């Protein structure tokens, strides 16, 4: 299974870069089949999806999540429709000017310093799809990606992965190497990453700190851009196809759609 995942990761990267889903499809089919077989052995007699949920977050089940998502959908979808129909969308074109990658790396460093991430225990790398991994609390590695025409994509990735990073860095030394290392559940881990990404780094208070730093790093690109314009652009809400690029309001729709597909 580990070999399959390694091979599939390479093919996924190739398929993503060339927009060639058929290249990755057979590997995805094999992964799904392997997961079904694995869950059947680990949880005999248990529904396959319930078994997978148990692996990712102990205690979750379809019986619990179906009414939860139905409630979220009933309340969230009308709000999204109202926002889209209001005709008062923020202009985020200012984020899609050419922002040199080297400057964006400086912005990443600014965000990491703002979050208080210990650089002696954490490094940042560049990948196709951002993630965070840890070997122990003294060796945590976060990653990001850079798009020259989308400066905040990287910044929010660093804020998100920085949340994961802070969770790992603040584990107790006594938990290193034990079954309790790595976080209580993936659900709790994700709550920390999205807390820093959305509640903190989209706030007016953070934008007030970010704005002068962006003017310092990108003086040409930030000409004519006010702090209010940056704040509104950072909080623009619009349905999109990419989960990791989704705004705070529409992001849950991606989770609900995936949930229905996976079931």
Model-identified regions with their sequence ranges:
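Secondary-structure capping and boundary motifs in well-ordered enzyme cores
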Residues: 27-30, 100, 134, 138, ...
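Active-site recognition of the HExxH zinc-binding catalytic motif
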Residues: 43, 146, 153-173, 190-197, ...
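Acidic/polar loop patches that form or flank catalytic/metal-binding clefts of enzymes
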Residues: 119-121, 174-178, 201-212
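Long, amphipathic alpha-helical stalk/connector segments used for oligomerization, subunit docking
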Residues: 203-263
């Amino acid at each position: 299974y580990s070999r399959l995942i390694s091979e599939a990761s390479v093919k996924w990267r190739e398929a993503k870069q060339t927009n060639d889903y058929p290249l990755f499809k057979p590997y995805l089919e094999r992964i799904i089949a392997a997961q079904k077989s694995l869950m059947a052995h680990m949880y005999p007699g248990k529904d396959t999806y319930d078994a997978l949920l148990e692996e990712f977050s102990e205690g979750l089940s379809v019986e619990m999540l179906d009414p939860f998502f139905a409630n979220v959908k009933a309340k969230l979808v009308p709000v999204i429709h109202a926002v889209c129909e209001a005709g008062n969308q923020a202009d985020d074109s200012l984020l899609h000017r050419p922002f040199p990658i080297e400057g964006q790396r400086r912005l990443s460093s600014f965000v990491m310093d703002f979050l208080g991430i210990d650089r002696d225990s954490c490094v940042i790398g560049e990948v196709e799809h951002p993630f965070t991994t840890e070997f122990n609390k003294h060796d945590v590695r976060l990653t990001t990606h850079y798009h020259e025409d989308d400066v905040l994509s990287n910044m929010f990735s660093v804020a998100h992965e920085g949340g994961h990073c802070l969770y790992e860095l603040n584990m107790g030394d006594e938990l290193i190497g034990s079954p309790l290392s790595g976080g209580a559940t993936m659900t709790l881990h994700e709550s920390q990453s999205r807390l820093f990404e959305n509640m903190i780094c989209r706030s007016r208070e953070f934008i007030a700190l970010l704005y002068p730093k962006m003017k310092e790093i990108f003086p040409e690109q930030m000409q004519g851009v006010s702090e209010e314009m940056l704040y509104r652009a950072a909080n623009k809400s619009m349905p999109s196809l990419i989960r990791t690029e989704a705004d705070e309001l529409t992001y849950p729709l991606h989770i609900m759609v995936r949930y229905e597909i996976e079931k």
